[in-house]
UniProtKB/Swiss-Prot annotation:
Name the record gives this protein: Cysteine protease Amb a 11.0101
Disulfide bridge partners, by residue number: C152-C193, C186-C226, C283-C334
Compositional bias ranges of the Basic and acidic residues kind: 350-370
PANTHER family, sorted: CYSTEINE PROTEASE FAMILY C1-RELATED
Molecular functions per Gene Ontology: cysteine-type endopeptidase activity; protein homodimerization activity
Length: 386
């Protein structure tokens, strides 16, 4: 059976889980070849990149110049020289964003954004009339720390878990990390590290009795055999819901009540090097990456935004988050309003004070550190051969 798949941006590079300091440079270094070479060598050392080639150096120069010029403009967002500075945007997109949701929708006979496009069809928040001007579920202790998916294309699992963790915290008052690895290993309707969708992940949780805490079923960054012995102290949900497509107001109603999983297209020079602020730049509307929306608001200049949690670790963007402009187009900027869904949890299960409910293990190991240097070198070697 043909299914849509989000084959995720899988950050198998150095920033995934280990913190990397920001890369700084002086404007005068951009004035000479020697200055650029010094920057390039310093950047390679910071990111543990052994390869030193004229082609990569030329791309590095091109990207640094574009980043520098962009940051001199009056834009509501800033860019930074990150670990992708020696990759062209085409290489970046082809390497980390090679899935086209619209392609799979066409095979199924669906139009883009056709998920529940009838605004009132089963949408539980359709009749909500009053919602706050600003919501940030991080401030309400409903969002866990930013995680890292590593070299596994499991963004769909991380996005689904953002929504599951959020609704559990809202209903029970307990913030618990849940297991992306269980979804990667056990949800056979999705493709593990080769991509997937959030809606089938929610359906798996419903049909298979729940999702375990991360402490019981920790993340390893690859698909393994489903280990049912680790599935205990589970969170159960009562259903799932799609947000009407091409409708940011419907999406805002949903996010006002709980974190939501969605798909976006992360492409374009700006997103490759995004650092901070409200992103208003170029990107497409063919979602290829799963993320969680954990809030919305408006900045001091009146630009409306979505607060989006990514799964590339805390050193990308704004400590692992990106603010995407809200209200830019019917699909939402980067297609954020085209493919959104959330779990339904009517009552705490177990009840709030049940000692047998899901809980974090304070002694559980943190996310594993992925060995990335060899993989990084392999990517660059392959790009040079193209």
């Amino acid at each position: 059976m043909e299914i849509n798949k989000l084959v995720c941006f899988s950050f198998s590079l150095v920033l995934i889980l280990g913190l990397v300091e920001s890369f700084h440079y002086h404007e005068r270094e951009l004035e000479s070849e020697e200055g650029f070479m010094g920057m390039y060598d310093r950047w390679r050392e910071q990111h543990n990149i052994e390869m030193r080639s004229p082609e990569r150096f030329n791309v590095f120069k091109y990207n640094v110049r574009r980043i520098h010029e962009s940051n001199k403009m009056d834009k509501p967002y800033k860019l930074k020289v990150n670990e992708f500075a020696d990759m062209t945007n085409l290489e970046f997109v082809n390497t980390y964003a090679n899935s086209k949701i619209s392609h799979f929708q066409a095979l199924r006979g669906s139009a883009p954004g056709s998920i529940d496009t009838d605004p009132n069809k089963d949408f539980i928040y359709a009749n909500v009339t009053k919602i706050p001007d600003k919501v940030d579920w991080r401030e309400k202790n409903a969002v866990t720390d930013v995680k890292g998916q590593g070299g596994c294309g499991s963004c769909w699992a991380f996005a689904a878990v953002v929504a599951l963790e959020g609704i559990n915290a809202i209903r029970t008052g307990k913030l618990v990390k849940f297991s992306e690895q269980q979804l990667v290993d056990c949800d056979m309707t999705n493709a593990g590290c080769d991509g997937g969708l959030m809606e089938p992940a929610f359906t798996y949780v419903i049909k298979h009795g729940g999702i375990a805490p991360e402490a019981s079923y920790p993340y390893v960054g690859k698909r393994e055999t489903c280990d049912k012995a680790k599935i205990k102290d589970v969170l159960k949900i009562d259903g799932r819901q799609n947000v009407p497509g091409l409708d940011e107001e419907a999406l805002r109603k949903a996010v006002a009540h709980q974190p939501v999983a969605t798909g976006i297209q992360l492409s374009g020079h700006g997103l490759q090097f995004y650092s901070e602020g409200v992103y208003t730049g170029d990107c497409g509307t063919e979602p290829n990456h799963g993320v969680g929306i954990v809030g919305y608001g408006e900045n001091e200049k009146g630009i409306k935004f979505w607060t989006v949690k990514n799964s590339w670790g805390p050193t990308w963007g704004e400590k692992g988050y990106i603010h995407l402009q809200r209200g830019a187009r019917k699909e939402g900027l980067c297609g954020v309003a085209m493919h959104s869904s959330f779990p339904i949890m009517n009552d705490p299960n177990p009840p709030k004070d049940d000692p047998n409910g899901p809980k974090d293990d304070p002694d559980a190991p943190k996310d594993p550190k992925f060995k990335t240097t060899q993989r990084l070198q392999g990517i660059r070697t392959k790009l040079l051969e193209l």
